[in-house]
Structure formats: C-alpha cells, structure tokens
C-alpha cells in the first residue's frame, strides 16, 4: 500500500507541478499554422499506438513526440501536453486499455512501475523544453548585444545592416545617408576625462534618436562617428533632417560636473534613389559619398552640413 501511495503521489507531482508553475492565461489566443500542429498530432498518434500495441514498452511511445513538442512549443504548452499525456496513460493503464500485464493478472507492483515510468518519461520533455527556452533567451541576448551599441543604445554597425533588411522598408524609393562626427570630441576627453566623453556620446545619441524618431535609423559606427539612414519618397526629406539634427545639437547644452558644454556636429550627406532589394548596396555607395562630404564639412570649419546635391553645400 505504501508503494502504491508513493508512486501515485510522485507521478501526480511530476505531472502537475510543472504545469501549475508555468500556467499562464494568454490575453490573446495564438494562431497555430498547420505545420505547427504536427508535433501535437504525432503525440496523439503515439498514444493511440500505445493502446494498439500494448506492453510495458508502449508507455514510452509518446516520448519522441513530447520531445518534438518541447523543441517547437513554449515550456507552458509543453508542460500542459506532458501533463495531459501522462494523465491519459495512467488512466488507460489503470483501466487495462493499455495492457502492460503481459498475460499475468494486473497487480499493484506493476501499477507502481507504470506510474514511475510515466513520471520519468514526463521529466525528459520538460527538461528539454526549459533547456531550449534558456538557449533561445541566450541567443536573443547575444543578438541584442551584437545589434545595439552598449554605451549609446543605438544600432551598432552590424545592427544597422540588419535593420536595413526590415520588411517595413519595402516602400523605400529614396535613401539619405548622413555621417555625423562630434566636433573636437578628443578635446572633451583630454580636458574632462573619458567618463565625460562616454556621457557625451550617450546623451548625443539619445538626442539624435529623439530628433530622428521613427523616420530613420541611427547607428554608432565607431568612436564619435554616427550614421543616420533616412528612407523616404522625397529626396529633400533627408537633407532637411540633417539640418534639423545639426541645429538641434548646437542648441542643446550638456552639463558635466556643474559645467555647461555646447556641442556641435559636422555632417556629410549622401543622397540618391534606392530600392528595397538593393538597399544595403545603396547604403554602402551613399556612405562613401557621405564620408567625402563629412571631410568637406570638417575642412571648411566644422558645424555644417555638406552634400554633393542641391546647391553643393548647406550651412
């Protein structure tokens, strides 16, 4: 009797506790595509096979399907499917629908073995599910660190190229690429220290991001150099945005240890027609143009916007 009680409590706990701990009621029920239902269908088929074939080994038939579910579904769904499968098997064994007696009368020791076997089987997909969830979470963190600059929280160079592949840019007909360089940034590091320099970069990036908003993409290319890509249908939009950025930076005071600093920025602008299918290549070509114009802005006194179009130079 003690063995029967122990096996019942143990198997019940293994099946129910993970399900209860991960239980969450979604606000909106997710829509499953036909191919996403294949693991669940395989699970149903494997349980039916257990009934048809019988024998003690048939209790493990659903295990491959449960592991498939663990790989494809969330831990919450996996725990629920594991609980339902285990409960169904226990009920089927108890009512001799799945025959594991192999010709001998059904006894408590056999039920003890069946319950422990089902509980052990249930642990495997749950462990796999949480392992997969942990790996996916880690991969997202790695991707986030690769795509965003840690200091400024804007896109990194690689993140910008990934963002240019976004389906939201399919309507792009024109692209303006700006290359921004904070004027005399080295003197800020020399006079106020690198901690101040890092703070300047962070505040500068946040200010640029606020000005650009959802109209463009902001990235730190390295050091004090930033890039802004503005997809549009109007060639003038990008140039107006560049001047808005330059003036916005010039008028924005920066405070460091009770001292007020004013920053200026030199901007080079590359502008031209672009297509979503070749957006990365178009960006690279316009970056070369923007780099040339940035050099001109710095050579001609800094704190200015230079472009090869629309009057050669805007100040």
Swiss-Prot record:
Q: Where is the GGDEF domain?
A: 173-310
**Catalyzed chemical reaction(s):** 2 GTP = 3',3'-c-di-GMP + 2 diphosphate
Annotated metabolic or biological route of this protein: Purine metabolism; 3',5'-cyclic di-GMP biosynthesis
Q: Sorted alphabetically, which keywords does the UniProt record give?
A: Cell membrane, GTP-binding, Magnesium, Membrane, Metal-binding, Nucleotide-binding, Transferase, Transmembrane, Transmembrane helix
Q: Which PROSITE patterns match?
A: GGDEF
Q: What transmembrane ranges does the database entry give?
A: 10-30, 41-61, 80-100, 116-136
Q: What class of enzyme is it?
A: transferase
Give the required cofactors: Mg(2+)
Q: Which NCBIfam families match?
A: GGDEF
Per UniProt, subunit arrangement is: Homodimer.
Q: What is this protein called?
A: Probable diguanylate cyclase DgcF
Q: Which organism is it from?
A: Escherichia coli (strain K12)
């Amino acid at each position: 009797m003690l063995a029967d009680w122990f096996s019942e409590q143990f198997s019940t706990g293994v099946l129910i506790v993970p399900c209860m701990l991960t239980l969450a009621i979604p606000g909106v029920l997710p829509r499953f595509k036909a191919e996403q239902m294949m693991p669940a269908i395989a699970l149903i088929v494997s349980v039916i096979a257990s009934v048809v074939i019988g024998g003690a080994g048939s209790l493990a038939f659903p295990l491959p399907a449960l592991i498939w579910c663990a790989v494809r579904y969330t831990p919450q769904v996996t725990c629920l499917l594991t609980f339902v499968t285990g409960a169904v098997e226990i009920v089927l064994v108890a009512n001799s629908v799945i025959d594991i007696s192999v010709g001998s009368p059904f006894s408590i020791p056999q039920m003890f073995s069946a319950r422990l076997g089902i509980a052990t089987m249930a642990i495997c997909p749950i462990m796999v599910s949480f392992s997969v969830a942990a790996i996916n979470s880690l991969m997202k963190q790695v991707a986030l660190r690769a795509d965003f600059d840690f200091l400024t929280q804007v896109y990194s160079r690689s993140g910008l190229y990934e963002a240019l592949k976004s389906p939201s840019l399919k309507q792009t007909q024109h692209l303006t690429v700006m290359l921004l360089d904070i004027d005399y940034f080295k003197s800020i590091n020399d006079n106020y220290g690198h901690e101040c320099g890092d703070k300047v970069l962070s505040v500068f990036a946040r200010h640029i991001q606020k000005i650009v908003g959802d109209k463009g993409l902001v990235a730190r290319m390295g050091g004090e150099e930033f890039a802004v890509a503005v997809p549009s249908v109007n060639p003038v939009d990008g140039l107006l945005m560049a001047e808005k950025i330059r003036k916005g930076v010039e008028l924005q005071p920066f405070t460091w240890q009770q001292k007020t600093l004013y920053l200026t920025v030199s901007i080079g602008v590359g502008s031209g027609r672009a297509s979503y299918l070749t957006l990365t290549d178009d960006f690279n070509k316009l970056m070369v143009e923007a780099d040339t114009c940035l050099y001109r802005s710095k050579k001609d006194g800094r704190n200015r916007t230079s472009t090869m179009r629309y009057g050669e130079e805007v100040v």
